[in-house]
């Protein structure tokens, strides 16, 4: 862990000094890893012979929200184990740390927003690839003080997001632009770390609003805040909850990655079909949530937005590239296919195995 911690320190210094000044205020600022990672992490990338034979995986998830329930279910219901995998789940909030851990070999697969994977790739980490997407839209709500009712009233206000470059940050900026507001000039955006911190900031009067995914939005609603808009209802196709790895890892351990995809797909089915078991697991991870909040979180994530097969989509990646064009000129010429490997989901789907689960 010493090497990883040392790298994170270097990464923080890099982003704080030159790189943040380059794209100040823009949502992809956390991923100025570029060529640094390609050279610095080469010594960590090689898997030992023992690792290559092992089915042990370290997999991260980026938030405590219903969006991560599929992964929790795969672990807690023994689905990973049933598919021959020994999985450690690690909570790592924020794209930079999980991406650094992936490229250093500390993690083999990461759960993250698609924007983190695409940004890392454009900045030089060309080996990263998106292999599955469980939510291909923005399942977030903008929650505000109750007296804010018109987009024009948002000008000059302060909003909380989990981090600059996070999905909550992207959602806020997307909404503001749709209302002809400039996210860098017309409002103040504060990275708060997590949804509980955003809610605390709103309660303390430090924030006028914040972006939440369920159940955070429901907790805010219960405290008297207003759902200004449900971003999911806008039908924006966007690779939001994704799983990524490296092409090298797929090449060296394709069968293992295939077992992960199969486990994920079984967990999706179990999430949809076993409500009592799913709620019990969600309660374990989403602490202090009452039953009504859990029920609504389940409805949104298991029944409303979750597909049967976790296909990454080119349109979902295209939306990310479009949003990056102003800060990363390379995004304009990039093709979505360069960031995605659909082959593992396709192989499982074409075998008829997914359809048979739902019969």
Question: What residue spans do the PLM features occupy?
Answer:
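Conserved C-terminal helix/tail region of periplasmic/extracytoplasmic solute-binding proteins
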Residues: 321-359
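Bacterial N-terminal signal peptides
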Residues: 28-43
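Short, glycine-/small- and polar/acidic-enriched structural segments
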Residues: 50-194, 198-204, 208-214, 227-237
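Secondary-structure end/capping motifs
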Residues: 251-332
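N-terminal export leaders
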Residues: 19-20, 36
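Sec/Tat signal peptide C-region and signal peptidase I cleavage site
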Residues: 44-48
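Pocket-lining segment of extracytoplasmic ligand-binding domains
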Residues: 196-287
